[in-house]
Amino acid sequence: VLRIKRLGHSGTLDPMATGVLPVFVGRATKACDIIPDRRKVYTAGFQLGVSTDTLDSTGKTLKTSDKAVARADLECAKSSFVGDIMQVPPMYSAIKVNGKKLYELARAGKEIEREPRAVHIDSIDIIEYDEASRRGVMKVDCEKGTYIRSVISDIGEKLGCGGMMTSLERSYSGGVDIKDCYTIEETAEICEQDKLSQMLIPLDRAFELSLIHISEPTRLQLIS
């Protein structure tokens, strides 16, 4: 689309996810590995009462529950997952175990024990929730490495009914807000008009820290 040889990106998105994925152009690609992209903000749709093998609506249903869940109970349950917590990563993830990605093992019908990992969640806000259908939308402000699918599934398990993610949008990542982003289609149209420079964000916008310390070899690499 951009017709530029040097491109890079920071982070990845789940197959069903949309939203912010910072793309680096030209010399800015040298900063891909040092961008402080710890903070992520997501808006996720969820359905309580259904558990799947992928922890989202793309997977195979494993169990269902008719248990009613009041909003007050949901608010209470989600508060247990705010702060520093231990989270078991889903089988359908890119984490490697003995050289194999977990999703490769999962697709082969294998499930292995996963060690819980330390993650940090700043806040979980229930934006919408319908008690009749037990469907809703939540906003999660967290650090890199947090699986939103697991957050929803774990909340569902705590409520005794299970839960799955139905949609996911990343609205913030590494200093970039979704309001400053473009879709692939919009990018293609802008490039056709030869106006790429109008959509580029200065590299320093991606650094959320006022000062970052780097080694001398790294400095020389960045300015070369």
What does each model-identified segment do?
Residues 6-36, 104:
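Glycine/acidic-rich beta-strand-loop module
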Residues 76-102:
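Long, charge-rich intrinsically disordered scaffolds of nucleic-acid metabolism proteins
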Residues 1, 22, 112-145, 149-160:
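The conserved catalytic core of RNA pseudouridine synthases
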Residues 44-46, 124, 138, 168:
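A structural signal for short, well-ordered beta-strand segments
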Residues 93, 97-122:
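Extended alpha-helical targeting/anchoring segments
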Residues 34-86:
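Acidic, low-complexity central loop/insert segments
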Residues 1-13, 72-76, 135, 139, ...:
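Accessory RNA 3′-end/elbow-binding domains used by RNA modification enzymes
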